[in-house]
From Swiss-Prot:
It comes from Spirochaeta aurantia. This is Acetaldehyde dehydrogenase. It is an enzyme of class 1 (oxidoreductase). It catalyses: acetaldehyde + NAD(+) + CoA = acetyl-CoA + NADH + H(+). Keywords: Aromatic hydrocarbons catabolism, NAD, Oxidoreductase. GO terms for biological process: catabolic process.
Amino acid sequence: MGRFPLAAKPLQVAILGTGNIGTDLLLKIQRSQLLKCVAFVGRSSQSSGMVKARSLGVPCSDLSIEYFRQNGEKIDLVFDATSAKDHLVHAPILRELGIRVIDLTPAKVGKMCIPAVHRSSLLNEWNLNMVTCGGQASSPLAWAIGQTQGSIEYLEVVSSIASKSAGPATRLNLDEYIHTTEKALAELSGAKNTKAILVLNPAEPCIDMQTTVFAKVDSPDLLKLQKLLSEVIPRTQAYVPGYQVALGPIVDNGRISIMVRVRGVGDYLPEYAGNLDIINCAAIAMAEEYAKAAHEQ
């Protein structure tokens, strides 16, 4: 096994996957004082993402995972913005090379990570899985419910996103999206049963991402829940500025409901694509935690 390095500042990172998520991630990294993108890696040198990266002076490669076999010693961390199927191939190679990974696919290889909940507690992990967009939006709420309520019989999350924000990888990974989101919800809330639903809304003009959490609990305690939400929601907003509570928490017939909306900052993607923005923001928040840890060593 390799070194799993933590570099001196800034952290030397690479992006694997040059689609919408990878390109938006690149623009966000350009603003970070703790991260430097030293490679933008995909399969097509003529993709729009590669063209954008070259215009920013970022080194590009169309060698895909093979690039890291040849240049792994230069890189501290890789963001994998490909697909769940591809990450199953990439993960063992990157581990053997000793490169840390933040996985933006629903592959479930690494530890599931929600920055507002876990933050620095997972920094010894070599692979962090950023769950899904719906998972990032709902998990802070599900965790707060699990921490403050009694037994949770059932927890359901419904996320509605604009159809135009769901690219090929999102549509290809729908089954993995459901399974990964449900697993994260169960782990964080302790619910006996969980269900995740994703709605692709074709409405024009495009809607912002909207996520609702429903939880059937014994003896709901709204005061305890509101107190913890007043802590975890600002922690989420610290890295996702467009994360806002739209409704609740409220109780109806023993069922707690909370709704949030997520609006993106409009780097490479439209502002309505909050579903893509939130997972990128979460990934960068964790990469910056790695960088801070390196600075303290």
